[in-house]
Swiss-Prot record:
A matching Pfam family: TGF_beta
Assembly and binders: Homodimer; disulfide-linked.
GO CC annotations, alphabetized: extracellular space
Sorted UniProt keywords: Cleavage on pair of basic residues, Developmental protein, Disulfide bond, Glycoprotein, Growth factor, Secreted, Signal
Gene, per the UniProt record: nodal4-a
Name the UniProt record assigns to this protein: Nodal homolog 4-A
Listed Gene3D superfamilies: Cystine-knot cytokines
Taxonomic path: Eukaryota, Metazoa, Chordata, Craniata, Vertebrata
Function: Cooperation and regulatory loops of multiple nodals are essential for mesendoderm patterning in early embryos. Plays a role in mesoderm formation and may be required for neural development.
Entry-listed glycosylation sites: 37, 238, 340
Range of residues in the leader sequence: 1-18
Top-level taxon: Eukaryota
InterPro entries (alphabetical): Cystine-knot_cytokine, TGF-b_C, TGF-beta-rel, TGFb_CS
Amino acid sequence: MHLYFYCLILLFVPGGNSLGINSYLKHMSNKPQDHVNRTKTVDSKDLAALPLSSYMLNLYQSFHHSELNHGTEGAPSLPSNHRADIIRSLAAKSFDHGGSRWTLVFDFSSLSQEEEHQLAEVRFDFRAFEGAISAEMEVMVDFLHQSSSCQSISGWCQSYLYVGSLTGTLRSRSSDTWVTFEATDIIHKWFERNEKGKSRYEDREKQLKKLPRAKSAERRYQQQNTEDQQIVMMVYSNISKKERLSGTATLLQDAAHSKYLVVMPGIQTIAHTRRHRRSHIFKEHVMGMKHVPPADSSRTLCRRVDFFVDFKQIGWDSWIIHPMKYNAYRCEGECPSPVNESVKPNNHAYMQSLLNYYVKGKAPEVCCVPIRMSSLSMVYYDHDDIAFQNHEGMIVEECGCQ
């Protein structure tokens, strides 16, 4: 049995990188009590299995505070002073280490090749590994991929895909309980692997035998992980230039791709729908929602009024973490004919209104619409990870006739 297992590992990862990973897989088989694994099937009914890290929570609170105080709008700041539209938190599914050699397992499935990835860094909780890691320590890290869709009857999966290895230095920041390891190259290797085709790498993905005493290892991880993830990879990315120029609503795209979205009663869907078909289903969901009727107004001029959004009412509480409610505001009221400066028309709206005043039916009447919007910071479940994004155009700041 041991001879067969060793030969299987040699096929799994070719070349010089195999030593550390071989030891890791061998260690999994021989000493499961020292190996930490949290691979479980996660569904929308058990979102507690995806704890919100303190880093992501602090990030959201920081931006939320800035928005409440009308701070400068912008994307989250990267550690290297770049900018990012989206920050994803990938918790390590399992890990092992011996000396300065680490083996980390992540699920990279949620990463989109259409985004522009700026930076990726692995964050180690110094408190959990005190004595094993330190700032300025040289380490070598082997990265494996394990898909969350890979399941067995017991909820455990032993299918791994080698992504790459990196050598570098652990860094720390002042007043921080984390040490970090830059892993941007691993993200590039992951997408390079996908571009070349999975067929070349099928020999690297092997089914391993079920770990002995897996349940005890699972309980041990939960005891160690009651407050925060011990190892997470933060991936900072920007939406593509094409997507930015298209003006497509980013929140609708996130909702369409969310596997946690609960379709409200009356909207038909298809079970186990593939990701590329969720957009169509989501459009049906949106079309089935009733529009909120405008408040009664007797020739009230265009103005901004309250419009409270409760994500639970539309079934989005299953994938949105923060905020659960917010005031989006909306515009209502009439536009005078012709318009004047009090309703903030642009030049085109002014000419359209003026022409329609003198020649009835020459052009449609101008409408009371948002003319200035602001963003909303949101934290939500993104597949089996947690993401932070500053969605633009979520709150009406000013209304006018255009």
